[in-house]
Amino acid sequence: MPPTLSCIRLSTLLDARFFHSSLPAAGAIALHACGVCHRNQAILFAARSPEPRHTLATLWRAYRPSSRVLSERRMIVRPTGSRFRAFADPAEEPGGSPGWDSPFLAAIHFIYPASVTSLRPLPHSHALARLLAWSTLPFPDLELTHQAIATAHVIVTRVPCTDLEFHPGRRVLDMVAPATD
């Protein structure tokens, strides 16, 4: 029986490491990403560096006050039937809740600072490579690593993934979530 994600209390780094290592057994992965809940849907902005994630979180807070930043650091993506839900990593954000009320995942954007903002859809193979590169994988457990790869593959085939080069400003938000606030 796979582990449940419902009652999580992480008090040490070792607890967090065990939690991240157990995610693939539950069909979930941890991703270095800023997560935003916009119109009851999660939008993830994945980046290796924390600076662009923080920049995006700041833009959401400034220009889309009705949206909620779930986390600037790491998000958990887990399956619910044929869809995925996203919630803040409880190791990073004490309020991260894996409950059934966490928002469904609408898109994953792999973000890069740039002088001009552009959005480019990714083929599944490129999205899979990026998702794995920016995930917390359960090394050195080979079986759980295979489960993580399989989960990531399902995610990129069901959730739109893009490369998002962005210049900080309102335009980047208009591209990924047109304003109607």
Explain the meaning of each model-derived region.
Residues 1-21, 158, 174-181:
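Charged, amphipathic alpha-helical linker segments immediately N-terminal to NTP-binding catalytic cores
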Residues 5-6, 23, 95, 139:
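A general structural-boundary detector
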Residues 7-42:
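A short mid-domain helix/strand-loop element embedded in enzyme catalytic domains
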Residues 32-34, 38-48, 61-181:
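Glycine-rich, often acidic-flanked micro-motifs
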Residues 51-53:
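Conserved glycine(s) of the Walker
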Residues 56-57:
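Post-Walker A alpha-helix
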